[in-house]
């Protein structure tokens, strides 16, 4: 089996079944380039408008340069909520369908769950797609996984008890043609009965940075798009302080392609809302560069609040 075939197999389980053999962190660390190999779900629902990703940076200077490159344009920011992205389709004011992000073009129909979280009717006569994030409060351990896992539940009766904990927070409505700015768009979404990234108390939900957008939608659209993201938006992620634990062991995992990758086995530690016990080590050179030994203390972060990574050895005092 080729490496790409193996990635597609894992992708199918991750996107469609919610039964991936990898944790979210391992998935993101090892398969961040999935879109590059062209994965498409075997079946599903096509979004009326693609749900694109965002270009991301951890560098304040890069963010400042990006804002400066659009001199004269107002840039608005909003929290980047960390949940499960979903598009909602309405036609003539009636709820039609809800679809998970999937690969950005095709997702899975979750209408039987989302109908409990969004308005059944809205005061708008045309067909529109409303994009947003299903989130769970930070008081729930692994809130991001809880939100995504809830949408993967097969039966309505299993989902309904979770409705009081879950919330759909809208951040986009398309087509944009009749809306002049993101500020107006978000206000209009609120008037239709939706919580938005501007109205919700983001301190109650997990976030992984900020989203910056050029407010004028006509100008934003003229910046164009890559195959991955719009050029008129930029996500800024804050590198948070790490947590100290100890290196218990190193496991060597051999992939189907024969590539051997070291994985750190850690003393379990909470980082944000997630219990972390494993982290990628990339290769032997990385282990030697950090001077790691079994039993030593290490500082661990979750890059972008997702990927567990050892950043340094911590010497005992």
Identify the function of each model-found stretch.
Residues 1-317:
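RNA/tRNA-interacting regions in translation and RNA-turnover enzymes
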